[in-house]
């Protein structure tokens, strides 16, 4: 899709650039960044990120700058309208999710409740 606004989940340039760098370090061009939701964390749900070279039935792929972000259907329902970004700061560097569906988030931003 060429229109980023039509996508159910946004993927920033900063996140795409970092994924591209990490994939280059792994020397496996088939890797994709998988974003998923699991139960846990201090708020009930938590975000997870992992590299994956497999696609599962129902996975959605969002491509940007030659790299792919993959989301399973169960996680996607909690992430619609959100944005995956990459930040570097005093707290370290990490991927973060801005999620309009979250009613509350923990202080570090890695878990949320609905």
From Swiss-Prot:
The keyword Iron belongs to this UniProt entry's keyword annotation: yes
PROSITE patterns referenced in this protein's UniProt entry, alphabetically: HESB
InterPro entries membership: FeS_biogenesis (IPR000361), FeS_cluster_insertion (IPR016092), FeS_cluster_insertion_CS (IPR017870), FeS_cluster_insertion_RrpA (IPR023063), HesB-like_dom_sf (IPR035903)
Cofactor(s), names only, from the UniProt record: iron-sulfur cluster
Record keywords: Iron, Iron-sulfur, Metal-binding
GO BP annotations listed: iron-sulfur cluster assembly
Molecular function GO terms recorded: 2 iron, 2 sulfur cluster binding; 4 iron, 4 sulfur cluster binding; iron ion binding
Gene3D superfamilies: HesB-like domain
Highest rank taxon of the organism: Bacteria
Listed GO CC annotations: cytosol
Binding site residues for iron-sulfur cluster: 42, 106, 108
Stored Pfam families: Fe-S_biosyn
UniProt subunit comment: Homodimer.
Cited function: Required for insertion of 4Fe-4S clusters for at least IspG.
HAMAP family for this protein: Fe_S_insert_ErpA (MF_01380)
Stated family: Belongs to the HesB/IscA family.
Full protein name: Iron-sulfur cluster insertion protein ErpA
Biological source species: Proteus mirabilis (strain HI4320)
Gene of this entry: erpA
């Amino acid at each position: 899709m060429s229109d980023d606004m039509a996508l159910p989940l946004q993927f920033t340039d900063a996140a795409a650039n970092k994924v591209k760098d990490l994939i280059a370090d792994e020397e496996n061009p088939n890797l994709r960044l998988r974003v998923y939701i699991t139960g846990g964390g201090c708020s009930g749900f938590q975000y997870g990120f992992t590299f994956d070279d497999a696609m599962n039935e129902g996975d959605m792929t969002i491509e940007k700058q030659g790299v792919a972000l993959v989301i399973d259907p169960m996680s996607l329902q909690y992430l619609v309208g959100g944005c995956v970004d990459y930040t570097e700061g005093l707290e370290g560097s990490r991927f973060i999710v801005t999620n309009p569906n979250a009613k509350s988030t923990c202080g570090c931003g890695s878990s949320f409740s609905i």
